[in-house]
Amino acid sequence: MKFIAIIPARYASTRFPGKPLADIQGKPMIQHVYERTSQVFAHCCVATDDTRIAEAVDRFGGCAVMTSPDHRSGTDRCAEALDKYSKTTGTAFDAVINVQG
């Protein structure tokens, strides 16, 4: 079976704006989540609607997929990212893991 882990990340969170970029021991929070996730899954990406998050992911060598800002949930964001990632890589997946950071 082929698995993909997708980490939905929004900058404009209502409870903790900017959470994905919050510094934790010298790294943005999203990097900590991505590094641990990529230790388990061969295919891993961050789904975001914010260029600041995408740029941070690019800086540490991760995979970021830009998604629409109009999604009502992280699951909707993951679905769009899965579609884009699958088309870009030509890979079909059997299961999607929605990783919350």
Show where each model-derived region lies.
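Short, low-complexity, intrinsically disordered N-terminal peptides in bacterial proteins
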Residues: 1-2, 89
